[in-house]
Amino acid sequence: MHTTDTETFEEQFAIEQRLVDSVVASFDSTTDPRLKELMQSLTRHLHAFIREVRLSEDEWSNAIAFLTAVGNITDDRRQEFILLSDVLGVSMQTIAVSNPAYEDATESTVFGPFFVEDAPEVTLGGDIAGGATGQPCWIEGTVTDTAGNPVPEARIEVWQNDEDGFYDVQYSDGRVSGRAHLFSDAHGRYRFWGMTPVPYPIPSDGPVGKMLAATNRSPMRVAHLHFMVTADGLRTLVTHIFVAGDPQLERGDSVFGVKDSLIKDFVEQPPGTPTPDGRHIGDRNWARCEFDIVLAPEQI
């Protein structure tokens, strides 16, 4: 009896579907309901991708080698897996589903791969540069909840790249610069000296950078400054502020992290302009930026 192409396709489809069903069923005894949901859904979607693109064995071997390389380059100073998540938009999608907009709360964005625990503390009005080079920038604002109440003693972690586009952890000398933490005062106010952010490329010497090059994608990030803000009873905020007027805003951000509400004016101040705290800047420009932070309730 002659077998038609349709019959052959249906037989192949049935073989593939039986495998999917078998793998999904293998998780039926999982006692944690959320873990069961995650593993079964992941299995269905992963197999659907393989079937849709007709993934070859060589392609899958290359994918495994790529993920192995991502793991091998990752250490306590470089998080290549976070970078991979960022450039695929997974980080921003997770943020979108996990941190829905709430009233006037400040919006979240990506964490990024360059956060380091135990950054040094600076006092209010202190300088986070720590010897890093860049245009001095005064940043100030108030931390409140969504009812407008000031939040005293909020812990504010800040970190940024230098004017050459590098974070301290990208240098091999163990320096700590361009990062610190501080606490808001009794009225929720905070202030510090940093550097005017500049755009920079994400690392291109690792597998993620090579992936972007292979797909003709730009590695550039829009100029930004990182914040992570924590306070009792309020939702932890991970966010950036972006520089209004940065040409990279029009070209796009390699990790899809820009939100309009986070674009802020960094107002250039000519040489000789008095600084808010009387600091002597010398014969150079500096900038200032105001960024008020609104924290959502921990439970929404």
UniProtKB/Swiss-Prot annotation:
The keyword Protease does not apply. Induction: By 4-NP. The keyword DNA damage does not apply. Pfam families: Dioxygenase_C, Dioxygenase_N. It is an enzyme of class 1 (oxidoreductase). This is Hydroxyquinol 1,2-dioxygenase. Its EC number is 1.13.11.37. Disruption phenotype: Cells lacking this gene completely lose the ability to grow on 4-NP, 4-NCA, and hydroxyquinol. Pathway: Aromatic compound metabolism; Xenobiotic degradation. Its cofactor is Fe(3+). Involved in the degradation of para-nitrophenol (4-NP). Catalyzes the conversion of hydroxyquinol to malelylacetate. Keywords: Aromatic hydrocarbons catabolism, Dioxygenase, Iron, Metal-binding, Oxidoreductase. GO terms for molecular function: 4-hydroxycatechol 1,2-dioxygenase activity; catechol 1,2-dioxygenase activity; ferric iron binding.
